[in-house]
Amino acid sequence: MPIRLYLIWGATTTGKTAQSVALARATGAPVISLDRVQCCHELAVGSGRPLPSELLGTRREYLCDRSVSSGVIPAADANQLLFDKVVRYSAHERALILEGGSVSLINAMIRDARWSALGEWALRRIVLPGRAVFIAQAIKRVRDMLEPPPGHASILDELEGLWAHPGNHAVLEDVDGYRQIIRYARASQVPIDRITSIDRSTMATLVERIAQEYWEHALWQEQEFLGIPATWRRADDA
């Protein structure tokens, strides 16, 4: 019997992780994140990696584990890693949940004919809401990233620690969230190694700018998505 592949996809900040956790609890299937930035464990907060407590006992894994200095994994390499993982899982799992994420990776999958012959697909696309709803969701997410509960790192902590290594700069400047913080720090002449000391007014400005950046990225993801091929075999209840 072919493995069932649940694909949950949609733009950034639309609730994919919550849906994948709910589906994993209902089916017992493991989740593989299709987010290429989440492969960098040092960017856990800024990339939206869920906390262990948020997984509610479900299984979740990432395509690989990379340092920021190695850069974000290219889409073609991510596609190959994912394909190999799915092949291995198909030997002992009845279903897998693929949660994405990276439109570049999903487009690489769409261009790869091998996916048409692997398993049955149950497709769940999350529709991008209107701007007002999206921005409200993004603001909550960004506030949580900037001001997490006590005992948890913030995106500012991540940036401050990583900035000490010049080899990380170009990568950080190319990732949503970190990019806006770096731009603001430079324009305001705030040293990155003191970024965790910003005041409430600056924090509010960063929330607005990062939320807007997420919205623009979400629109780009929607425009770039190629569409699921008709050759992908659908499961009966897809």
Curated annotation (Swiss-Prot):
The organism is Ralstonia solanacearum
Gene3D superfamilies referenced in this protein's UniProt entry, alphabetically: Crystal structure of tRNA isopentenylpyrophosphate transferase (bh2366) domain, P-loop containing nucleotide triphosphate hydrolases
The GO biological-process annotations, alphabetized, read as: cytokinin biosynthetic process
Transmembrane segment boundaries:
none
Q: Which UniProt keywords apply?
A: Cytokinin biosynthesis, Transferase
EC number assigned by the record = 2.5.1.27
Q: Which InterPro entries match?
A: P-loop_NTPase, Tzs
Q: Please give the name of this protein.
A: Adenylate dimethylallyltransferase
Q: Family membership, please give it.
A: Belongs to the isopentenyl transferase family.
Q: What class of enzyme is it?
A: transferase
Xref: Pfam families: IPT
Q: What's one GO MF term for it? A: AMP dimethylallyltransferase activity
- In the UniProt record, the gene name given for this protein reads tzs
Q: What does this protein do?
A: Transfers dimethylallyl groups to AMP as part of the biosynthesis of cytokinin phytohormones.
The reply to whether Transferase figures as a keyword in the UniProt entry is: yes
Q: Which SUPFAM superfamilies does the record cross-reference, listed alphabetically?
A: P-loop containing nucleoside triphosphate hydrolases
Q: Which reaction does it catalyse?
A: dimethylallyl diphosphate + AMP = N(6)-(dimethylallyl)adenosine 5'-phosphate + diphosphate
